[in-house]
Amino acid sequence: MGSVVDAPVVVEGVAENMLGDKKVTVVFVLGGPGSGKGTQCANIVEHFGFTHLSAGDLLRAEIKSGSENGTMIENMIKEGKIVPSEVTIKLLQDAMIKNENDKFLIDGFPRNEENRAAFENVTKISPAFVLFFDCSEEEMERRLLGRNQGRVDDNIETIRKRFKVFVESSLPVIEHYNAKNKVKKIDAAKPISEVFEDVKAIFAPYAKVE
């Protein structure tokens, strides 16, 4: 997995860029529910100094706030639908602006081609690369059902809806970036420590300077 990683993509501040003159490196982290994205993002944060922005966590925080926006998001998630791009992009933008870091892992977004195009058009940011955690549905289902303190939406029917949404919506995003040689594919069915060895090889150019 020690392939050469694309140079970080930095974006000059332009009028349309909602981040102002802030230059950032963004890595999209994609993979099905239960593929281990969250665990590995935590490792990347610790070892390589990135800030982890989970689209799902940001959406759940909005739900918890009790806002009208949060109620709409909650209903869509229960139905296994994808939240409108502008809602998630606004949450991600706000998080990047507020954070002093300039290296971000965006986990679980873009979820579809419309998300992807909207993110690039609104923020003027193109990812340095896409980290794709590839894992079978059988293994992901086993992991999700085996969680001691699973999320409230971790029941088998909802899990399978989430798999279906991922396959139909997210795989075209991965194919789009693969055509640009921007996808770094990880075998996520392996044990956590082995997966991280593969991740470390990809992120070596981003090692923190002590």
Swiss-Prot record:
E.C. numbers: 2.7.4.14
Taxonomic superkingdom: Eukaryota
One Pfam short name: ADK
Region span, LID: 146-154
Region (NMP): 54-83
Binding, a ribonucleoside 5'-phosphate: R60, K81, I82, V83, G108, F109, P110, R111, R151, R162
GO molecular function: (d)CMP kinase activity; ATP binding; CMP kinase activity; dCMP kinase activity; UMP kinase activity
Record remark on domains: Consists of three domains, a large central CORE domain and two small peripheral domains, NMPbind and LID, which undergo movements during catalysis. The LID domain closes over the site of phosphoryl transfer upon ATP binding. Assembling and dissambling the active center during each catalytic cycle provides an effective means to prevent ATP hydrolysis.
Oligomeric form and interacting partners: Monomer.
PANTHER family referenced in this protein's UniProt entry, alphabetically: NUCLEOTIDE KINASE
Family according to the record: Belongs to the adenylate kinase family. UMP-CMP kinase subfamily.
Name this polypeptide is given: UMP-CMP kinase 3
Organism name: Oryza sativa subsp. japonica (Rice)
Gene: URA6
